[in-house]
Each structure stands twice: as C-alpha cells, then as structure tokens.
Amino acid sequence: MKLTLVRHTSLDIASNICYGQSDVDVSAQFDAERQTLQTKLSKFEFDAIYASPLQRCHKLAHALCADASLGFAATDIQIDPRLKELHFGDWEMNTWDAIPREIFDVWANDYANLAPPNGETFTQLQLRAKAFIEDVSSHLHGKNILVVTHGGLIRALIAEVLQMPLKGLFRITIDYASVTQLEFKDEIPKVHFVNH
C-alpha cells in the first residue's frame, strides 16, 4: 500500500499560536496553494481518499475532489478522526509565549511521553496513526491511498517507518501543501519522498 500524505494548506492564524486540534480555517492563499498541489498530485493515481475531520483538511480534500483529475467525488472522501493533529490540550489557541517557559521546556524535552495539560503525547498520536494504517491496509492492501492530514501526524508516520525516536520529529520539515509518500509493503516499509 502506498500512502501519499498531503499536509493542509496555510492557515488563517498568527504563526505564534498553538492550534493543534483547534478547527482553524485556511488562509487567503488557499486557492493558489491548492492549484499547485493539484498539479503535484496529477502525476499519481489513487484508489481511495481519506481526510482529517478538521476543516483545514476537509476543505482541501473537497477542493481537490472538485477537480476531476483525481477521479473522486466529494462523497468519496472518508473522514477519520485518527488523522487529526496532536491535541495540545489547555495550550490550544494560546500564544507559545503564554505557556510558562518551565512547563514548556519540560514538555519539549520529552514530548514523546509527556502531554500538555489535557492534551496528548506524540506517542499517542503515533499510535492512532499506526491504527489507521493497520485498518486501511487490511482492506486496501496494495492500493494507492491519498490522505489529507497534518504535519505532526506525517512526522510521526515517517518516524515509524524509519524506526527513529520521536525525539527527532522536528528535524523533519513538512511544509503547508506538501506531499510525502510512504509505502507499506512486505515487512519493510519505505519512505519514497518527503515534503515535495
């Protein structure tokens, strides 16, 4: 199974805001970013499309399906809550500077195992991403799947495929409207490309 992971387009929010699972809308650059993405995706054929339920992903999936080149209708989009971004709990919609430095630093040193208050750990995010992969591959084995999701989830899946510690996640750049492709075949999953 090939998994083509698309990160949502840029957002209508200041860059210093922690947003995670908050349902933030897309920016004014949405149409231009979507067109560029559509061109990138036109090189591939897909058998199914999945998206996070957050509007920044759902909107993009709908817009991509509106172009007949993908071969999907909006009704073909399968929404899966396991594809959501990391839940930052009480930190959501606060500026990063508003989070007490001593608390943030402890979390930043072990975000794989520590959660923001009322949030989740990156390990929990990775586990739900893996559960999604296992479910989808059980009935779409050998197929090409398009997934519209978030940077944190894409990084967690790359870490899983490369068997790297989650501590190194933020060494991987995943830009808005970028494409990453992973393959789950046989015993050894592979990274085909990242942040294209």
Where are the language model's segments positioned?
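Short, conserved phosphate/pyrophosphate- and ester-handling motifs at nucleotide-, phospho-/glycolipid
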Residues: 8, 150
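Active-site-proximal alpha-helix that buttresses catalytic centers in soluble enzyme cores
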Residues: 9-70
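Short beta-strand scaffold positions
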Residues: 51-52, 127, 148-149
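Acidic, low-complexity terminal tails and accessory targeting/binding regions
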Residues: 86-97, 138-143, 159-196
